[in-house]
A protein has these predicted regions:
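Midchain, well-structured core segments that form catalytic/ion-binding scaffolds
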Residues: 103, 119, 125-138, 172-302, ...
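His/Asp/Glu-rich mid-to-C-terminal helical/loop segments that flank catalytic regions of hydrolases
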Residues: 32, 232-251, 285-300, 333, ...
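N-terminal capping segment at the start of a domain
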Residues: 2-28, 128-129, 221, 318, ...
Length: 405
């Protein structure tokens, strides 16, 4: 099976995760792809192929003769797609030798170069895009397809020397639960890489420190005709809180290493309201200050409206993996060298998000993130470059070789 065939097969399987579910995986449909990957690994001849009760699918490419003592390297990707948009009945469209012009997704929707100027970098590439009614699922089925294609190649070419390689596929990454039950010891890798990045050349070993904040507001509903000095409108209190957030510290005004507060949900009546945020910053000190600001602001509003009107629940989600990866420079050096040997110019920059690898790094498995070739994740404008995906396969193979040198 070719890389392209694999990818098209995988995106046809709905694997949308659900943040409101309490099961794990959060949706039963994820098992369809996970079980298919287990069978495919077995057909390719991988050893120690397993899937546990949580849906973690793993397999081993055994070390070539004489390289059994090399570090064990892992490659990981997640099978779920974001709950932001439907991943069911995905109908990919393929453009051979993209000409750099606007792309018609359907009769009512066009992906314009003016809106997505990075399209101009893909002239001459084979692009795979949506029909405008679903997301594509390149995040992260591009990574899944690349790992499986590299595994097939290495199994078929024993002359390529490498140590033991472990590959793994996880559910529920998109809702932040991807490695909640992942057994690092069972996986058995010394170092690993997630194939979950975007643009060709991306190598990321810095990510946000992340927290979630949920504020419940207890209002006081009184007939509006007689509400003076009595009513507390929970909706207006929520709006007041939101308006206190510095405008420049919102996602649409930040880039690079700049953190933010992002309102991700609101539900309310005069009597009750809830407003939810995610808090992000690469710098831990700034991250802590952002959390402290939220506590202080809620306290200030409680002083204004009455103690107990606002109740804040704030939880840390994950941390910047940099401090866990930097003590192992070979992890980055080998990835950089592998990219250059694949004729890929490395782009080292911080992830403005998080990956399974961020949490795994704090669980004892240093795990930076490598490009998978997709763009515009989580929505109807998602697309990927088959050329970049092919480069990612070469990078995986080259990394395997590098660790055995």
């Amino acid at each position: 099976m070719t890389l392209k065939e694999r990818f098209l097969k995988y995106v046809a399987i709905n694997t949308r995760s659900d943040e409101n579910s309490e099961s794990f995986p959060s949706t039963a449909v994820q098992w369809n792809l996970l079980n298919a990957l287990v069978e495919e690994m077995k057909l390719l001849g991988l050893e120690d192929v397993t899937i546990d009760k949580y849906g973690y699918a793993m397999g081993t490419i055994p070390a070539t003769k004489g390289k059994e003592g090399a570090p064990v390297i892992g490659f990981l990707a997640h099978v779920d797609t974001a709950p932001d948009m439907s991943g069911e009945n995905v109908r990919p469209h393929i453009i051979e030798c993209y000409d750099g012009k606007d792309i018609t997704l359907n009769n009512a929707l066009t992906m314009r170069v003016a809106d997505f100027p990075e399209l101009s970098k893909f002239v001459g590439h084979t692009l795979i895009h949506t029909d405008g009614t679903t997301l594509l699922g390149a995040d992260d089925k591009a990574g899944v397809a690349e790992i499986m294609t590299a595994a097939e190649y290495l199994m078929a070419h024993p002359e390529i020397e490498h140590g033991k390689i472990r590959i793994g596929f996880t559910p529920d990454e998109e809702i932040g639960r991807g490695v909640d039950f992942f057994d690092v010891k069972t996986f058995g890798a010394d170092f690993a890489y997630t194939m979950d990045g975007g643009y060709e050349g991306e190598l990321e070993y810095e990510n946000f420190n992340a927290a979630s904040a949920k504020i419940a507001i207890q209002g006081r509903n009184v007939h509006p005709g007689y509400a003076k000095n009595k009513m507390i409108n929970a909706i207006e209190v929520a709006c007041e809180l939101n308006n206190l957030i510095p405008a420049v510290e919102r996602p649409q005004f930040t880039e690079g290493y700049e953190g933010f507060y992002h309102c991700v949900g609101f539900n309310g009546t005069v009597e009750n309201a809830t407003i939810s945020y995610i808090i992000r910053d690469h710098d831990f000190e700034k991250f802590e200050k952002k959390k402290a600001w939220m506590y202080d602001t809620v306290g200030m509003l409680n002083n204004k409206y009455g103690q107990g009107v606002l109740t804040l629940t704030l939880k840390d989600q994950y941390y910047n993996m940099r401090k866990m990866v930097e003590p192992h420079p070979q992890v980055i050096d080998n990835a950089l060298a592998a990219m250059r040997e694949a004729d890929v110019e490395p782009i080292v920059r911080p992830i403005r998000g998080g990956t399974d690898g961020a949490r795994l790094s704090f669980m004892g498995l240093p795990c930076p993130n490598i490009f998978a070739g997709g763009m515009n994740f989580h929505g109807k404008f998602e697309y990927c470059s088959l050329n970049s995906m092919e480069k990612a396969v070469k990078v995986i193979i080259n990394i395997a070789k590098k660790w055995a040198e």
